[in-house]
């Protein structure tokens, strides 16, 4: 998968318009971060990419195929998704949750294999949850559940990861660990993020949304500016640059002239 083309995408709930004519060509083989204040439409846009929301108006095309025409099993083999909420009705262990990521490769009633369990062990190790394999998923903390759900994505062996606020509930150690991990997979990532400095560190391309529209798209150096912070977030801040030329947002406004 190389490209996702979104054209004139609208979405409404009742009389409220959530997405207002989204148009963008997004690389599906790089790390793309969606930015913007709460309620701007980031999660809703992502849910169109992984087909939770049907398309009401406009189009979403992955490479040359409209997403509605991609068979669900094929889509699940290509795209791994980690949403914001992880409610589980039954008492599954962490290992069982991760094993579900192999479902797109299974026929009905096909048993899990030794190779499947090996993938699960490796994935849990990569997210720092190997010792929790037999623990109840529902008894894990929010951050631990996040890491287990990412492990489930990893065993899908997808070409694209869609992550909705993947650093929620994580302490800074695991925020950095998870983003470093997904960055190093060598596959496409589209992630909604709130931390602008983390987005600048890990994303190749930033997509900034405001009030259901895409306001601007560019590299971290192009996007993270004093003017953008004021326009999108309504805050005064200073922007400096590290040794690699990446922007760093400093919210201590008393330093501003």
Set out the residue ranges of the language-model regions.
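The feature captures the beta-strand-to-loop junction immediately N-terminal to the Walker
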Residues: 35-37
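Helix-to-loop junction immediately C-terminal to a conserved catalytic motif
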Residues: 50
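Conserved ABC ATPase "signature" region
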Residues: 99, 114-132
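A short, proline-enriched helix->beta-strand linker immediately N-terminal to the Walker B motif
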Residues: 155-159
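Catalytic Walker B motif of ABC-type/P-loop ATPase nucleotide-binding domains
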Residues: 161-165
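ABC ATPase nucleotide-binding domains
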Residues: 231-257
């Amino acid at each position: 998968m190389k490209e996702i083309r979104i054209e004139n995408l609208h979405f409404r709930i009742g009389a409220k318009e959530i997405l207002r004519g989204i148009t963008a060509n997004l690389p599906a083989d790089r790390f793309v971060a969606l930015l913007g204040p709460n309620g701007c439409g980031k999660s809703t846009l992502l849910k169109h990419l992984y087909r939770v929301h049907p398309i009401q108006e406009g189009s979403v095309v992955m490479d040359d195929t409209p997403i509605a025409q991609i068979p669900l099993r094929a889509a699940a083999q290509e795209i791994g998704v980690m949403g914001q909420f992880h409610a589980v009705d039954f008492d599954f262990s962490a290992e069982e949750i991760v094993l579900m990521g192999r479902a797109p490769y299974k026929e009905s009633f096909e048993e899990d294999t030794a190779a499947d369990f090996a993938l699960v062990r490796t994935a849990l190790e990569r997210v720092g949850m190997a010792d929790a394999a037999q623990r109840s998923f529902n008894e894990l903390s929010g951050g631990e559940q996040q890491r287990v759900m990412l492990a489930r994505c990893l065993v899908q062996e997808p070409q694209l990861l869609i992550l909705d606020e993947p650093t929620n509930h994580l302490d800074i150690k695991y925020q950095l660990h998870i983003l470093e991990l997904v960055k190093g997979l060598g596959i496409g990532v589209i992630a909604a993020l709130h931390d602008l400095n983390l987005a600048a560190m890990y994303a190749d391309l930033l997509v900034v949304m405001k009030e259901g529209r895409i306001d601007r798209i560019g590299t971290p150096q192009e996007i993270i500016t004093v003017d953008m912070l004021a326009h999108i977030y309504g805050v005064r801040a200073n922007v400096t640059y590290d040794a690699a030329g990446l922007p760093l947002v400093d919210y201590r406004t008393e330093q501003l002239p």
